[in-house]
């Protein structure tokens, strides 16, 4: 009797695992935004190697060198609050973008012209600028950094 039950339950278990497994470990758009753009711990401290270190540690140089990226040095809650601020049109024409009401501390990383994968080298520049983020989901949170202004 126990073997019959196992033979019936095992295929169901395999079917269930095949259905659930694809969602396991998949990064959400909000998680990707946090990984690629949030560095609440502080600023780049004028370190010329900040972008090289951060781009590598945040997995943006694994298969190629991401050409441009911006890190935001503000609390996550403050950046999430932008989703309830001034609604603006996104670069792609969508209407789910929002502009920060104040300038934020950011670091721009630009790939140096002579840099080639796997040796990704970046210029590091600090600014205080407004950011524009695309928001989505429930809760409504940033999923894309659209621009800095």
UniProtKB/Swiss-Prot annotation:
Q: Which residues cross the membrane?
A: none
Q: Which residues form a coiled coil?
A: none
Q: Does the keyword Ribosomal protein apply?
A: no
Please give the biological process terms from Gene Ontology that the record holds: defense response to Gram-positive bacterium
Question: Which Gene3D superfamilies does UniProt cross-reference here?
Answer: Ribonuclease A-like domain
**If you read the UniProt record, what top EC class would you report for this enzyme, in one word?**
lyase
Q: What is this protein called?
A: Ribonuclease pancreatic
Q: Which organism is it from?
A: Mus pahari
